[in-house]
Amino acid sequence: MIKQQFHLRNYDWVVTFYYDVSAHDFYAVMNHLHIIGCKGENFVMAWNNINKGCCNRGLTYSDFGGKQSVVVVGEASTFGELMNSLSHEIHHLSVHIAQSNDLDLAGEEVCYIDGEVTQRVFEAFISGTSYNMLSTFDASSPLSLDSCTDHSCWKGCSRMNR
């Protein structure tokens, strides 16, 4: 699991991303969700989502009052699925921030939020590590831990690679 946290200054919003989350990471992620106020039905839904340990899953939970969000992107079966999960969860995050700030969901500013978050995510994958994680993948092939010589890259879905 990879954890990234950043602050969106224009909205005074703290975002924590968890990438490559598997059932093994379950308690750490659930604890963070609980800390920021995820309770009741939302907590049960998150519990079931993360605890399944399946590929190509994600979730976004936001504490509107505390101006903070937790975004979870699970293991991915392919590079395309990884990109799909990332863009899907980034969209949820952007909508939450927009709703909290009474922004027009069809307006340009929501797209700027998407763009800023995407840049931050990109930095985590490229600049934030000494190893270029994306260079090891063939976009048409399932991701595999075996394709990475130092095992620092995205391992993909363990069920798909065994």
List each model region and its residues.
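Membrane-embedded glycan transfer/ligation machinery
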Residues: 80, 84, 112
